[in-house]
Amino acid sequence: DAVRWHFIGHLQSNKVKYIAGFVHMIHTVDSLKLLQEINKQAAKHQRIIPCLLQLHIAREETKYGLSFEEAAEIINDPKVVGLKNVRIIGLMGMATNTENEIAVQHEFVSLKHFFDRMREQHPELTVLSMGMSGDYKLALSAGSTMVRIGSTIFGERTYPSAT
């Protein structure tokens, strides 16, 4: 129990069964369908899995996530309240991968404002995850409560070259 596995990558519904028995938190819930599947698989293991809704705040189409409107619909959906084996405890967003700090700061601030609005009605939302190794200082200044800094800790990823 000393290690807490956080799932931070894109998660397909058909892969949830492989992590539901041990994952501590899932950071990348980007649909109601995925949330329902996490609930179903967590129930099989008699667990409650904390989740973050992933919001699409970047200007890059390669990133996944919900719009603010879609996230609000899920947070306020009575069906979600009935899901007994998942808990939405916050929001996660990744900013555009750019050197333009003003643009990145704007994306983080807009997510923080949305988080604050949602939290007024849903005080159980306590985690705002934004910021990675390259932009975590901007994220913290905007109000992030959780950062992902694996590259800073472990070094940049190296991929084997194709031969």
Model-derived regions, located:
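Glycine-rich phosphate-binding active-site loops on the catalytic face of alpha/beta enzymes
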Residues: 30-34, 132, 136-163
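Conserved alpha/beta-domain cores
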Residues: 1-134, 142
